[in-house]
Amino acid sequence: MDQVTYIKDMIRGSLMAAAAGDALGYAVEFIDKSTIDKLYGSDGIMAFELNGSKALISDDTQMSLFTANGLLMGVTRCAMRGIGSRPEEYVYVAYRDWYYTQTRDRRIEDSYSWLRALPQMYSLRAPGITCMNACESIVQRDEPQNNSKGGGGIMRVAPIALLHSGYIARARSFYTHEELARAGVTIARCTHKHPLGFLPAALLTLLLAEIITMSPEEVALRIESVVAKCLSVVGELYGVEYRDDVLYLEELTQRALRVAHSHLTDVEAISLLGQGWTADEAWAIALYCAVHHIDSVERAIIAAVNHDGDSDSTGSICGNVMGAICGYNHIAERSIFCPTGRSLEQTLELSDVILAIADDLSTSCLINEYDALDTPEKQLWFERYCEMKPTGIRQM
């Protein structure tokens, strides 16, 4: 398999496994482990809780998709005009569109994403208060004011690492490690202002960009050294300005790695890391589950959602990591968490939208200001990211 095809599969895997973890955890997000056990047995929830025939995603997946749409609109705008801001600067306007889907706020007239045109994006799935309040400020053209370290920033940041990987696979320059870390911080910090609300996003971004190019066997051997490298980059960038927070994040990350090699049960280990309601804890829980269950995407995600805390976010972040390791073909073949006889694409809500976004992230921008739009692929790209039309997507 050539590098472009391989990375495309890993990008698909990261987004789809994240959505699967989100959907699995969404069913138990607001109940504790003892209640989960009463409802699903001592092993916890291990299969999708279906609404009709679909496993429903939460606001985590919604916002991840809008993040990706904003990034892709940004790179396209730069290509078509020859100038522009960095792609991560365009997620702000994409989040305005997400806010519109949740509120139908009439002040938001212009659309900057084709996702906004899809009726299926308008479902309310327990959107986070911090994200909603921050987006309200963005709509008012104010800077969001809070000191939140909630997990609403890190759970949506993966697309910047995936976009970067798509460019690298095609031997096109994109970001340095430092620039990539800053991009992750920018995306999370636009809504969450506490350092522990945005620094973990840099770690996740760096981790995904590193492991996505490796074989599963190589990741299993090297993941701890990769995490150490990620910590080093974040420490160099932010260790002076946010010294105490960086030191704490380093200690928590090391604790997650230590318990991943212990004889503790998943529930016992996760209890030492938190509940996942904050970005630092969500990062630590997802990392523990991925390292401890490095050879099984199912076991990793199941562990990540069966605890007392923010199950959909920890499941989603763990899915981002595990999907970037094993790829989409692997999880599709296994129909993870699906009823017997049904595929992941059939079962997971918005799977067609998720895969379309994933493929666009892996493609890199197809057009520029001098382009004749002389192929169907270029025309589709123009309609999605210049005209904001959901071309090629079935509307429900």
Question: Can you name each region flagged by the protein language model?
Answer:
Residues 1-396:
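Structured, active/binding-site neighborhoods that engage oxygen-rich ligands
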